[in-house]
Curated annotation (Swiss-Prot):
The gene is ssaA2. This is Staphylococcal secretory antigen ssaA2. One of its GO terms (cellular component) is extracellular region. It comes from Staphylococcus aureus (strain NCTC 8325 / PS 47). Sequence repeats lie at residues 83-85, 86-88, 89-91, 95-97, 101-103, 104-106, 113-115. Residues 83-115 are annotated as: 7 X 3 AA repeats of Y-[NS]-N. The lineage of its organism: Bacteria, Bacillati, Bacillota, Bacilli, Bacillales.
Length: 267
């Protein structure tokens, strides 16, 4: 639709320009500087020119930068409740839509939060589970209580308890096999292993040793790993399943001496 524009130029450098469509031109000029709120195609603007020749616009109505022909224009756009103020400087465009920016930030935070929670979404589980990625990754400096030792039973001299009844692919399943089945097959989730081991007569303390089982109650199901070695500086090398890479995947890591002091060890 063809636009008709009229302008009144003041000697002080102030201009009022009314723009409307076709037969709405006259009415628009008489109503709110040419802007007719009942006409979806109507818009108007006023502007001042400073001493440097820069234009400063105030717009109302339906408007888009492509509708204004300015050879030298740098527009900073600030959107507030549908009322648009624009400052025209020199060369190029800069857009600052605060509402959109805030929405983007919120969406991003929501995504990260949901992404983190997705690691904690568990389907129906049976006994003897290990930790998910998010829980096991927090198994650092866990405060534990030393469980009492009992009748001297140990992993190194124990007897095979039989079939592995833990859930395949979980940390408990791996550790049971790694110690040759010389522990109970019905100790439940990893979080329960220290207490179950103590009741069964195994030594449980906070001292790491090669061949022991490292255990923590951290997370929804706890976590267990097999101690491969203890280094001269006190750091502990462990192997484990379902730690950060999903069920069935065996990985290894080295834990510092200070971190290791926060875990239980079943001997």
């Amino acid at each position: 639709m063809k636009k008709i524009a009229t302008a009144t130029i003041a000697t002080a450098g102030f201009a009022t320009i009314a723009i409307a469509s076709g037969n709405q031109a006259h009415a628009s000029e008489q109503d709110n500087y040419g802007y007719n709120p009942n006409d979806p195609t109507s818009y108007s603007y006023t502007y001042t020119i400073d001493a440097q020749g820069n234009y400063h616009y105030t717009w109302k109505g339906n408007w888009h930068p492509s509708q204004l022909n300015q050879d030298n224009g740098y527009y900073s756009y600030y959107y507030y409740n549908g009322y648009n103020n624009y400052n025209n400087y020199n060369n190029g465009y800069s857009y600052n839509n605060y509402s959109r920016y805030n929405n983007y930030s919120n969406n991003n935070q929501s995504y990260n939060y949901n992404n983190y929670n997705s690691y904690n979404t568990n389907s129906y589980r049976t006994g003897g589970l290990g930790a998910s990625y998010s829980t096991s990754s927090n198994n650092v400096q866990v405060t534990t209580t030393m469980a009492p030792s009992s009748n001297g039973r140990s992993i190194s001299s124990g007897y095979t308890s039989g079939r592995n009844l833990y859930t395949s692919g979980q940390c408990t399943y791996y550790v049971f096999d790694r110690v040759g089945g010389k522990i109970g097959s019905t100790w439940g989730n990893a979080s329960n292993w220290a207490n179950a081991a103590a009741r069964a007569g195994y030594t449980v303390n906070n001292t790491p040793k090669a061949g022991a089982i490292m255990q923590t109650t951290q997370g929804a199901y706890g976590h267990v790993a097999y101690v491969e070695s203890v280094n001269s500086n006190g750091s502990v090398r462990v192997s484990e399943m379902n730690y950060g890479y999903g069920p069935g995947v065996v990985t290894s890591r080295t834990i510092s001496a200070s971190q290791a002091a926060g875990y239980n060890f079943i001997h």
